[in-house]
Each structure stands twice: as C-alpha cells, then as structure tokens.
Design a protein with these regions (language model features):
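ATP-binding N-terminal substructure of ATP-dependent carboxylate-amine bond-forming enzymes
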Residues: 1-94
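Active-site nucleotide/adenylate-binding loops and adjacent lid/helix of ATP-dependent enzymes
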Residues: 5, 102-182, 241-252
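Solvent-exposed alpha-helices and their adjacent loops that cap or buttress functional pockets
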Residues: 21, 38, 91, 113-115, ...
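Short, charged, surface-exposed secondary-structure boundary motifs
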Residues: 38-41, 56-57, 99-105, 218-219, ...
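Internal nucleotide-binding/catalytic subdomain
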Residues: 157-292
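Active-site "cap" helix and flanking loop/linker of ATP-utilizing ligase/carboxylase catalytic domains
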Residues: 247-269, 286-347, 351-355
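Peripheral (often C-terminal) accessory segments that flank ATP-dependent C-N-forming ligase machineries
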Residues: 310-420
Length: 420
C-alpha cells in the first residue's frame, strides 16, 4: 500500500512517520514535505499544496490508496472535494465542512444554533460598529480575524484601546487581507485552555488524548502568538468528567449539527476548549490536526494508524488503542525572530536517536547535502514519553542543552502548568 500526506511541517512529519510504521505500507510520500523527513525514510514529492490537479495526477500515477491532508488552507481551498471528484479517497473534511475553521463567524453560528457553549460575540465588517461594540462591552476582550491567519489572527486585548487598534488593523489596514475583512469580537473567558481531538466520520467519532499547547513565543506565556511552541498529552490534571462533558455538550452536537446542515464531517476535528467556572466552552474549531499537538499525540497511539484511518474512510469501526504510560511532551525549536522576521540557513544539530524523536518542520539540506539547515520559522521539535511531566521535561531539556542551538530559540517551560 502506498500513501500520500499533503503538507510540509512537523505535523505532516509525525503523520507520515506513524503511517510508515504499518506493516501494510510500502511507501509514504509527502508533498511537498521538507528535507528532514527523508531521515525517516519518507519520500518527498515536489508539488505544492495548492497544486491540486498535479497532486491528483501524482496519486493516480503512483497508485496511492488514500491521501491524508494536513494543512488548513488546502482544506479550505477544497482539496478533498477535488480528490473525491477524481475518484480518490482523502482523509479530511470537504470545503463546506472545513468552514468550521475557515470562518470563525460560521463556527459561532453553528454553536449558537446547536446550543454549544462558547463566548458571547458580535461579527462586524464595519469598523465604527465594531468600535462601538468594544466600547460598550469593555475589556479584556478578544478580537479575531474571521478567516485563516496562520494562528496569528487573534488578539487578546487588555484594554479597549488595544482592541480598537487590532480591529482597525484588520478591517481598515488589511493586515490579514480577505481573512480580516470581517472580525469576530468576543468576551474574554477565564480558565485553563486545552485541546480535544477526534477522528470523525459523520456522527461516528473517536476521541484522542487531551493535549495542552503553548501558543506564546516566550517563557511565562509572554510575547506574540505563534503556531505553537510546544505541547504535552494527556493533560494530567484534567478530570475525565470534563472530557465527558465536552464530548456530550460540544463534540456530539456539533457533528450532528453539521450533518443537519448538509455538511457531514470526515477527518480530524480539533476543539480548542477552555475550562471555565461554568464548564468547558469552545474557543475555536480547527478542521485538522494541530501543530505541535499531532507530534505529541500520535506517539501515544499503539494501534495500527494506517489500518485505523483505512477503516474510518471505509465506514468501518476502527480498533484504536492508546498507551496509558505517563505523558508525552515536546518542545519546538524555532528560528530567532519567529513569529516575525526570522533568519534562515542555520546549521541544525544531528537527529536524535532512542527515546527522543525529532520531527522536522522548516529544514533543508545544504547545497552539498551534508548538513540540514533551518528553512522556516519553526524548525524542529523534540518529543519524548516518560512517567511524569517532570521526567519528560528533564529528558528534552538536557538534550537541548547539549545541542548547538545558536541562531535558534525555544521555551524552557513547556509542561510546567502540569507540575503542581
């Protein structure tokens, strides 16, 4: 069996590496991938995620059994619809089902209609109306670009002035282009955030271990929002009852609602949740695996990932099993300057062996192919599984202390919220 993973980051490295572990899989291609993936025996295909017709041609020519779609923008552009129209199987939602992610306003409408707990909100395309709403509600308050913005279109404003400025940047200064042509302004929710993922086909879903991501660039949750600087799973201090409540009040009604809307969901659904005094509420939905959460969830999967996805695609009941060992924790190493302007071309340390997995995101071979160089904002991620968060931290950080990370940076407090 040959498979295709579409995307190029650490998330796709983790997906492809896990698929390749299956005894039934002969080859896993990644389009376009990154050079670091080849160290794990993955084959790169030089086709960008936006070239749907070329990807379809490749899948047909290479007898690909099915494709796994990683990135949000490919899903929003209807890549799954095009694969299906060409008679090809793809694991991911259609464009209409993925609107849960590519329009925050649509997601809010679905939540209100199907009684899913979330923050109170208003949606605006007119700056003066948005400004009046912000001034009426006061701060703290959250301003979000309606469309996709690489995880950077959310501003948690501590003052009214800051919220108005963020709204001005989105609506009038076109900071995010069409993605910011509308803004969702919502109440600030107090509580602890966590991520809940599920494999989904229609009204059937299979919950994964909970995870906690670290979005801010620097220690102590300081600095600008990023795509994510590290994560761990499961969240040890989160009661099972909270997960059960989230499944009953959030996952089930949303998936049933999507069927009623004529947009049945297939793929991975990510619910970004916050545990408030009133129980779990939705901050956002993503229509795919998170990055970096994928890299710490998939190592915990003990069943055959390829068989699991094949069964879900075929409408069969998958046999999905997870390890109950301790915790899996990962730390992202990024280029200096990320998430703003960052440098490239920094030589990377050798790939780790043994208990520490290296997943590559922005990595490229030098011209003489002897060294891997940085070629993106987030460059690589080190992941390990241990009995406790503290042990996992010690393993990762002692390895990072040995590595030459000049020109790169990482947070030194990933997982610390779990140590109480």
């Amino acid at each position: 069996m040959k498979l295709l993973v579409v995307g190029s980051g650490g998330r796709e490295h983790a997906i492809a590496k896990k698929l390749l572990e299956s005894k039934d899989v002969e080859k896993v291609f990644v389009a376009p991938g990154n050079d670091g993936m080849t160290l794990d025996g993955l084959e790169l295909v030089n086709i960008s995620i936006s070239e749907h017709s070329k990807l379809i041609e490749f899948a047909k020519a290479n007898d690909i059994a099915w494709s796994f779609i990683g990135p949000d923008d490919a899903l929003a552009a209807g890549i799954v619809d095009e694969f299906n129209a060409a008679g090809l199987k793809a694991f991911g939602p259609t464009r209409l089902a993925a609107e849960l992610e590519w329009s925050k306003d649509f997601a809010k409408e679905i939540m209100v209609k199907y009684d899913v707990p979330t923050a109170a909100y208003g949606t605006f395309s007119d700056f003066e109306e948005a400004k009046a709403y912000i001034e009426e509600k006061g701060s703290p308050i959250v301003v979000k670009a309606d469309g996709l913005a690489l995880g950077k279109g959310v501003v948690v404003a501590e003052t009214v002035e800051q919220a108005v400025e963020a709204t001005h940047e989105m609506l009038l200064d076109n900071k995010f282009g069409d993605s910011g042509a509308r803004v969702v302004v919502e109440e600030f929710l107090e509580g602890e955030e966590f991520s809940l993922f599920a494999f989904v086909n229609g009204d059937k879903f299979y919950i994964m271990p909970t995870a906690q991501d670290h979005k801010r660039a620097y220690d102590g949750d300081k600095g600008p929002n990023t795509g994510g600087m590290g994560a761990y799973a499961p969240v040890p201090h989160l009661p099972e009852s909270v997960v059960d409540t989230a499944v009953d009040t959030i996952v089930k009604p949303v998936l049933e609602g999507m069927i009623q809307e004529g947009r049945p969901y297939l793929g991975v659904l990510y619910a970004g949740l916050i545990l408030t005094a009133d129980g779990p509420k939705v901050i956002e939905f993503n229509a795919r695996f998170g990055d970096p959460e994928t890299q710490i969830i998939l190592p915990r999967l003990t069943s055959d990932f390829t068989q699991n996805i094949t069964d879900i695609l075929d409408g069969k009941e998958p046999s999905i099993t997870w390890t109950d060992k301790g915790v899996t924790l990962g730390v992202v190493v990024a280029s200096n300057g990320y998430p703003l302007d960052y440098e490239k071309g920094v030589e990377l340390p050798a790939k780790t062996e043994g208990d520490i997995i290296t997943y590559y995101a922005g990595a490229k071979f030098s011209e003489n192919s002897r060294a891997l160089l940085s070629n993106g904002g987030r460059v690589y991620m080190l992941v390990t599984t241990a009995d406790t968060v503290k042990e996992a931290q010690d393993t990762i950080y002692s390895e990072l202390n040995k590595q030459n990370t000049e020109g790169l940076f990482y947070r030194t407090d990933i997982g610390s919220k779990a140590i109480r």
